[in-house]
């Protein structure tokens, strides 16, 4: 299966021919991906809205998880 979006050969993290991450790359895109690496745990990737807390990167994924408010 695809590891990354192989639509653009300009993406330095993704091999456009194979749709696989290039050697050494952890990710190709996402709010918690920077220069082919996961952003460190605790970095804010989405600011708080209303009563919800800031969403923070996990350090293990390129996706920005949604933190849910618990009353």
Swiss-Prot record:
Organs and tissues of expression: Expressed by the venom gland.
One GO BP: cell adhesion
Q: SUPFAM superfamilies, from UniProt?
A: Blood coagulation inhibitor (disintegrin)
Q: Which residues form a coiled coil?
A: none
Please give the positions of the paired cysteines in each disulfide bond: 4-19, 6-14, 13-36, 27-33, 32-57, 45-64
> Where does the sequence pass through the membrane?
none
Is the Disulfide bond keyword given for this protein? Answer: yes
**What molecular functions are annotated in GO for this chain?**
toxin activity
PANTHER family from the xrefs? ADAM A DISINTEGRIN AND METALLOPROTEASE DOMAIN, DISINTEGRIN AND METALLOPROTEINASE DOMAIN-CONTAINING PROTEIN 28
Remaining remarks: The disintegrin belongs to the medium disintegrin subfamily.
Q: Describe its function.
A: Inhibits fibrinogen interaction with platelets. Acts by binding to alpha-IIb/beta-3 (ITGA2B/ITGB3) on the platelet surface and inhibits aggregation induced by ADP, thrombin, platelet-activating factor and collagen. Inhibits cell adhesion to vitronectin, probably by blocking its receptor integrin alpha-V/beta-3 (ITGAV/ITGB3), and to fibronectin in vitro. Shows little to no cytotoxicity in vitro.
Q: What is this protein called?
A: Disintegrin tzabcanin
Organism, by scientific name, is Crotalus tzabcan (Yucatan neotropical rattlesnake)
